[in-house]
């Protein structure tokens, strides 16, 4: 029992800074929306449309680079720290190549925006302008993620948290300058949010690099000599590990976007209630998602040390802590769902629907916690392909079709509206949790030599 308590302390020491960093990141998006809304409703809508395109694109790159964390954690655990700097350099090359692709996609996203039915031309122009300003921050964001993954792979999560809050504090005044045109800058409205956020990502990256250069604990890593050129073999391995994670993230984001589109014809009340419940459940998701990142580090580190039993302990501890957290957040959601809904809107119909949907959200929080932590465990084992297959099957083969049938057809019951989609979420997330656990058990029952050989690739 003592080993689980000790492991839980180590996990939480890693997870809490990651949680706070994620809160800072979320707060930046909130600040952009509020400050753009203070300028005009059109600018706020433009930022919302632009963000809905930016997120899937940048999260794809983010997911690709998540491969670095278990690689660095295992090298650190095995005492092969001299190889870490080379992996990080290749991570920067990969981030640079992916940034170019993302920037090209975002530059041409105007075709998607203007294709939207009945969109106001002025709104479309502002959304395109916002994206074309924001896209210059894509390299800064992804370079920051490489540096952050280096620190977190070495079990140092606090730098990412500090840089997140630095970014938030810088974002507010820079937003103000570019939205309203102060200190000789042009008045750009919502487009100014894109300029500010792009600049902030570069500030965060440069601040993180400055920290890494000065950190005594990483002196041996930054002094490591080696080629700075792209090395196809290393980059290929990072892509093989990271691409399934990137695709899984992309599938998850697009799933919720598709459901939002399917709900939109049902009316204002249904759309508002769905959005409130989704926004709140996304906030709750920060907890297990951050814990999953910590579990990846701990499992990878233990495998690097050559201890499959300690890796199992880290995995089981992460699951136990995650289930405890999810139980508490579910109780909180059920107990205060109406009061939470009232914070968003005071329309009685909207509040009633949102409260009902949050009840369904509480049901799946434990499954959601298990599946996302399970994904983190599999990343630690470098078993990332299974994450993609499980995500695709659970969300797109089971969850979305069942939600569609329940929400919009009478094949099983009378059309349930948004609640049908949320039952689909429950089906999808529960299926994902079961499959993640089965895959984890399959891996852990392999002979230790095979587990370590797979993990060291």
From Swiss-Prot:
Subcellular location: Cell inner membrane
Example of a GO biological process term: sodium ion transport
Gene Ontology CC: plasma membrane
Pfam families xrefs: MatE
Residue ranges crossing the lipid bilayer per the database entry: 11-31, 53-73, 93-113, 127-147, 160-180, 189-209, 243-263, 276-296, 314-334, 350-370, 387-407, 418-438
Stretches assigned to coiled coil: none
Record topological domains on the Periplasmic side: 32-52, 114-126, 181-188, 264-275, 335-349, 408-417
Cytoplasmic side stretches: 1-10, 74-92, 148-159, 210-242, 297-313, 371-386, 439-457
Recorded family membership: Belongs to the multi antimicrobial extrusion (MATE) (TC 2.A.66.1) family. MdtK subfamily.
Protein known as: Multidrug resistance protein MdtK
Organism from which the protein derives: Shigella flexneri serotype 5b (strain 8401)
Record gene name: mdtK
